């Protein structure tokens, strides 16, 4: 009897231990704190029209540091003060972030205990140096008005594990212990410069009609930038006609002269891909030019001294001449010229290698400079009719001619205005582009040398 009792007792003990172990690993629902905040807006009275600055703070695990970014409204534009007030012109990013905290309804209140901040990943990034577990640092966004008064601020933590869409996240208002659950997409909360700027450097739209894209592939010796001759590889031109696209290729002979050749299928494909890449030119940073160089590029005139561009040589650019009311250059890595049907031209000059390490990346980067102008030959003068008899007065053909002349003058004026607006945007900056981007813009063509 005693033996049977001991066996039964032992079996009950094993069952109890097994039940405890199962309970410890079973995904029981977490406790929800009852709160009046549930089903109410997280930020009462928040109005996006009052937002004048955006602050982002996130922890970068690879670099083991907190990265910060400030975006500020300046007149009609948003600018990045940390990047010499470069314009943050990614409308999609700005719209998403400014509206990110609007109408955020509290779905649950999960905790009032400060010790749970680690568990839910809502530790303020500002506590980086004292945080025990840095993976618990959340993403912080703060929106302020013109007087730097905070309108709304939120730390976004971990996503809920049982949410298939992974949109529900734990969040906390800085300075408060409560942890809530809201629907929010935190991907836009990033200090990454590239997320805030548009890669459409040429400001091309669906209404813009390309005329042609010309690639001049050559090299200059940076150490002899003043005297170095072009080491030419090829020149390609993609011409966009009304009914078809033509590809013209000239390759360099041993004496450096260009000779037209028939491009093979592979070369044609590469040239077409290069032309297509002009619509999106990603850049990772910007550097300001000297004030004198920027002024001379913003308002080009022949009276400017070439010495205004002296500082550009160490970046791989040398001025060559003033032509068609535009300063023209040679650049260490060749150039790409884009012409549009309205007469506007933009030349992308590819400069020297940027020796500064950026974002702990070992990849090579280059300087890029853009200059806009107008090519009047793209809007040809109308043919003048034969002189009419003195007695006949103004003939119909003469009236048509005068209308065409007036239309050309109008088109050129619009083109010059657009070129001036582009130079206003381009003149201050060297853009930092990757080696991969250079290879897309100015590709190597098999059988052409370089």
What do the PLM-derived regions correspond to, one by one?
Residues 2-450:
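Secondary-structure "cap/kink" motif recognition
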């Amino acid at each position: 009897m005693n033996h049977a009792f001991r066996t039964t007792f032992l079996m009950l003990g094993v069952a109890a231990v097994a039940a405890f172990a199962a309970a410890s690993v079973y995904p029981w629902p977490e406790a929800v704190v009852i709160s009046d905040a549930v089903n109410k807006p997280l930020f009462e009275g928040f109005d996006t029209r009052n937002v004048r600055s955006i602050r982002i703070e996130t922890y970068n695990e690879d670099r083991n540091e907190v990265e910060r970014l400030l975006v500020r409204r300046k007149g009609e534009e948003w600018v990045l003060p940390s990047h010499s007030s470069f314009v943050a012109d990614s409308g999609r990013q700005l719209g998403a972030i400014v509206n990110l905290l609007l109408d955020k309804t509290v779905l649950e209140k999960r905790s009032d205990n400060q010790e749970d901040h680690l568990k839910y990943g809502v530790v303020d990034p500002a506590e980086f140096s004292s945080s025990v577990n840095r993976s618990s640092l959340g993403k912080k966004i703060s929106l302020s008005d013109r007087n730097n008064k905070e309108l709304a601020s939120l730390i976004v933590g971990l996503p809920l594990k049982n949410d298939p869409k992974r949109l529900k996240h734990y969040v906390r208002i800085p300075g408060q212990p409560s942890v809530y659950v809201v629907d929010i997409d935190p991907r836009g909360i990033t200090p990454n410069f590239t997320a805030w700027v548009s890669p459409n450097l040429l400001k091309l739209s669906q209404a813009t009609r390309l005329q042609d894209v010309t690639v001049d592939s050559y090299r200059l010796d940076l150490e002899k930038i003043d005297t170095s001759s072009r080491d030419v590889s090829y020149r390609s031109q993609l011409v966009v006609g009304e009914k078809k696209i033509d590809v013209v290729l000239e390759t360099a002979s041993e004496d450096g002269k260009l000779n037209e050749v028939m491009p093979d299928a592979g070369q044609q494909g590469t040239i077409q891909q290069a032309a297509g890449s002009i619509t999106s030119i990603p850049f990772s940073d910007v550097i300001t030019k000297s004030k004198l160089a920027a002024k001379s590029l913003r308002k080009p005139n022949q009276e400017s001294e070439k010495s205004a561009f002296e500082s550009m040589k160490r970046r791989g650019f040398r001025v060559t001449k003033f032509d068609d009311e535009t300063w023209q250059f040679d650049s260490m890595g060749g150039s790409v010229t884009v012409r549009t049907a309205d007469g506007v031209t933009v030349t992308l000059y590819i400069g020297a290698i940027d020796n500064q390490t950026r974002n702990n990346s070992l990849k090579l980067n280059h300087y890029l400079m853009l200059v806009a102008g107008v090519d009047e030959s793209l809007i040809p003068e109308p043919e003048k009719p034969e002189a009419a008899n003195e007695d006949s007065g103004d003939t119909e053909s003469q009236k048509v001619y005068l209308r065409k002349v007036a239309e050309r003058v109008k088109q050129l004026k619009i083109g010059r205005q657009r070129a001036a607006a582009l130079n206003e945007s381009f003149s201050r900056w060297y853009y930092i582009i990757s080696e991969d981007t250079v290879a897309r813009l100015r590709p190597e063509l098999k059988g052409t040398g370089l």
